[in-house]
Amino acid sequence: MPVSTTLLQSDLPGLPLRHRGKVRDVFDIPRDRLPADAPPGDYLLMVATDRLSAFDVVLPDPIPGKGEMLCQVSNFWFHKTEHLMPNHLVDIRVEQVLPEGVDPALYAKRAVVTRKLKPVPVEAIARGYVIGSGWKDYQRTGKISGIELPDGLRQAEKLPEPIFTPSTKAAVGDHDENIDFDAMVKTVGAELAERVRDATLRIYRFAADFAAERGILLADTKFEFGTDADGRLYIMDEMLTPDSSRYWPADQYEPGTSPPSYDKQFVRDYLETLDWGKTAPGPRLPADVIDRTRAKYAEALQRLAGISVD
């Protein structure tokens, strides 16, 4: 899979920009840009750029091809798990909705057409290991998101059972905050909260088993869900990518340590060496950090989905 031109920001005349996130640009698709046989409803074009964020700050340097790799990992998992949960993808090709004069090759592997859904205003996180913010919470309270855990767990230790730990959905530049299930119920209602929790854990278990067969541990992951006009629940946005998940090589896993991961850890480690306040604007990245980070994303894509990057 040759990497296409690096894309830091997408601008598509004729498609109204709905949202520009840390990585994805989302556009409304006017009805006159849809194929004549498109089912009734509203649709979005979601573009995965090559932007990179760390510590909730979008950095000035992109990772070449990252958006394509993220999009392909997501699409792989959306199709792999559609027997477990419907997703936001629809059968409309990207080139059918792009404005005139836009090179389809630039967007073919980094964009998807999706249903327009009402987002559930909570991040749905599944954890199988005690690491990251969960490890910090556990050290302080013996709990993660209000869930009591056994005493004496070490950093990165596998939990007795996967747990559901929701968080707030922060705006770009702000920080998500872990909340307990009762707080989620107050936000979205008991019935929807239970559906999201059950779907999150069901998908996590399936994906963790699948990844383990390929020598990868899925430590934790974050999902986003949305509902349609009839209240049907869909998984949306991205799915089980190195940006939304913590993947570890099984042969390098050791409880009591912070295992290496298939993500932007090289970037975070480099930034921690700088005198930087973790606020915008972010610092520039050295070429070797960019190259090593890209290689980690490419390795994850190949090992999980069997797709090689040239």
Swiss-Prot record:
EC top class, as a word: ligase
Disulfide bonds: none
UniProt keyword list: ATP-binding, Ligase, Nucleotide-binding, Purine biosynthesis
Source organism (scientific name): Xanthomonas axonopodis pv. citri (strain 306)
Protein name in the entry: Phosphoribosylaminoimidazole-succinocarboxamide synthase
Pfam families named in the record: SAICAR_synt (PF01259)
Protein's UniProt keywords contain GTP-binding: no
MF GO annotations: ATP binding; phosphoribosylaminoimidazolesuccinocarboxamide synthase activity
One GO process term, biological-process aspect: 'de novo' IMP biosynthetic process
Gene label: purC
Pathway participation: Purine metabolism; IMP biosynthesis via de novo pathway; 5-amino-1-(5-phospho-D-ribosyl)imidazole-4-carboxamide from 5-amino-1-(5-phospho-D-ribosyl)imidazole-4-carboxylate: step 1/2
